[in-house]
Design a protein with these regions (language model features):
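Short, glycine-/small-residue-rich phosphate/pyrophosphate-handling segment
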Residues: 109-146
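A structural micro-motif
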Residues: 26-28, 106, 133-134
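Short, conserved loop/helix-junction motifs that constitute active-site signature segments
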Residues: 73, 99-105, 129-130
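N-terminal beta1-alpha1-beta2 submodule of the flavodoxin-like/Rossmannoid cofactor-binding fold
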Residues: 1-78, 88-90, 95-99, 148-159
Length: 159
């Protein structure tokens, strides 16, 4: 069995809950992707065209800085990457995270939380950030997703 990591970014705590349940269900290590400058409630106001999140998501080259890196990334074969869906894709801080490592030969599996949006163009936007990695199609979960739901999803991946 390969060593697994569940890395996640959570703005509201919902993705954190799903990530912790996933890690517990599959016996994986956990790493929180934290922005160097934490997001405020105003930063996350998607209705404000001048909010930080809106500005970042409007710029495909935006790469918000992350506070810390995972030192032993080379030990992991499979990396689950979790995030809330923003504008039908992963927040650009996920690109920052992926681009911070050599992921060649690793399996990357995105998972997301959303109140109603699907994965949209997430894989299309993440693929350039993890060259040489096997990027699987992910799944969206809601805040009520149980460990059993997550385990059932993992079974479909044939890892």
């Amino acid at each position: 069995m390969s060593k697994r990591l569940v890395a996640y970014f959570s703005a509201s705590g919902i993705t954190a809950k799903v990530a912790e349940n996933l890690a517990d269900a599959i016996g994986a290590d956990v790493f929180e992707i934290q922005p160097e400058v934490p997001y405020t409630k105003a930063d996350l106001n998607w209705m404000d065209k001048k909010s930080r999140s809106t500005i970042e998501m409007s710029d495909p080259n935006s790469r918000p800085a992350i506070a810390t890196k995972r030192d032993n990334m080379d030990e992991y074969d499979t990396i689950f990457v979790g995030f809330p869906i923003w504008w039908y894709v992963a927040p650009t801080i996920i690109n920052t995270f992926l681009e911070s490592y050599n992921l060649k030969g690793k399996t990357i599996i995105p998972f997301a939380t959303s109140g109603g949006s699907g994965m949209g163009k997430t894989n299309e936007k993440l693929a350039p950030s993890c060259p040489g990695a096997k990027l699987l199609h992910g799944k969206v979960f809601n805040s009520y997703s149980s460990k059993a739901d997550l385990s059932a999803w993992i079974e479909t991946l044939s890892l």
